[in-house]
Amino acid sequence: LVNYTDKMDLGPETFEPNLLMDVLRYIEEHYRDGRLNELCHLLGYDIYWLSRAIKKMTGKNYKELLQIKRLNLAAHLLLNTRATISDISIEVGYDNTSYFHRLFREYFGISPKEYRREKKIRV
């Protein structure tokens, strides 16, 4: 996620320099249950303003950044643990395993099971 800092497009609006780092840090620390309204409260910003600022700075919305974090962590866990796909789904913040499978396939182009089988590192 930190890679998004080099894609910042501040344009004519000026954002607090550390805002993006604060957002990304929050996602890193609260990926299981992080909520945009909680982040806004912590940082003291209006939800609509912060949503727009995140999109402008990264090209992605808050939910997309959160999903990227969750899915990349899930991929790491698939390759480096023996946890079940269902357990990994819950570990990264998805209560609905079917939804997790769908998002994983959309993001990586293959199912979690196929990902583990094709890219497996011996554990």
What residues fall within each predicted segment?
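AAA+ ATPase active-site-proximal loops
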Residues: P17
